[in-house]
Each structure stands twice: as structure tokens, then as C-alpha cells.
Amino acid sequence: MKISRSSAVGALSLLVCPFVALSTALSQPVHGWLSWRGPNQNGTSLEKNLPDKIDANKPLWTADLPGQSTPVIANGHLYILGYAGEGPDLQEVITCLDAETGKQLWQHGYSDFLSDTIYHRYATSSPTIEPETGNVYMQGTQGILAAFTADGAKLWDLSMMEVYGRLTFPNGRTASPLIDRDLVITRGITANWGAHGPGGDRFYAFDKKTGELVWASAPGDRPTCSVS
């Protein structure tokens, strides 16, 4: 799929520096910038001897990827969310690029459906790379949670909208999946049945290998409003 649309809000140009390409073999633990804001999710790198400054006018390569996602990188592959098309043809896409050359290696797209997301607010979360296998996880604004191998083979996907009832992400603010041992954890505002009937922001934990639900939780009390 060729992405040709760009906008002042959504056109993202990736500035790639030499130190982002990592060549660790997949048989070894995966190293890199594996999740939103890095290894400790605090925006800092554990790498040594990094450049003091980066010249934005001299990138190794650029790629036009509409969206507000940020890239994750491992073993020479860069993964990022974006979107393509308009109206009923709009799809959110996860794209894998060669971190050294910017060449597109693979891409998967999911159509939007029953979403209250405003245009240009798609693809706000980041993919997450599982450190043991290099598998990649994504969460879309339409409620799709999906897992892929580093080479782009789909392991599983799940439509949370269809399984867990009404689902929304205010202003398109989806979660970047979190890997915790054997679980992949995400969240969304849902309304279903029984204890999870009332609308609320809930966490969902799935088996990272199969996509089967392990637990769901609605922490804290529902917000209240008082008028005096």
C-alpha cells in the first residue's frame, strides 16, 4: 500500500541516525528502543557514545508516514503506526522499515469501523517489541489488538470492539501495548455486561502468544460530578 496523503498534523518525517540500527541476532535477547519512550519509558537511552547533537537537515533518510505515532527499533527494523486513505477507505497501518535505508519491508492495515475518532488523530500510539522473540504488538483506534513476527507474519489479532462491547478512545488516545512476562496489556473505555456493564476505563491483559484474555480490571471508582 502506498501512502501518499500528508497533512500539517499527520505528516511525520522520520530522522534516522546511524546508531539506531542494531544487528543482534534473533536467537539472542532483543535489544533496541522497544517501546514508547524507550527501555524504561522515560525518554532516555542506555546507549553510550551517542552524538551530542543531530542535524535535522542531514537525515540518512526520510519517510512520509501520516500519524502521531513514534517509532520503535530492534535488530535493524523500525516499526511505526500510520494511516492511509480517507473516509470509508481509511486504514490504520503498521509499517516495518529497514532502519538503515528506510526501505519498506512489510505493512499491515486495518479499516476503521464504529469509531468516534476525528481525522488526523489516528495512529497515536506506538508499537511494542517483545524482548524475548522480537514479536511486535499494536493497538488501533478501532479496537484491534494484533501481534506480528519481526518478518511481518500475523500471529493473531483481536477485535476488542466485537468481543468486549462498546469501545472508545477519547480523541484517538490509544494505549501503546505493555509487555509483562507472558502478558500483553492494553486499555480502553468499554461498556459490556455484568460487573463490566457501566462504561469505564479498563485494563485488559492477554496471553501474548495466543491473544486469549487472562484478566480484565476497572481500577478505582467511577468519577462523580457535584454541582453546588
List PLM regions with ranges.
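N-terminal secretory signal peptides that target proteins for export/translocation
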Residues: 1-9
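Noncatalytic, solvent-exposed loop/strand surfaces
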Residues: 26-228
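Bacterial N-terminal signal peptides
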Residues: 10-23
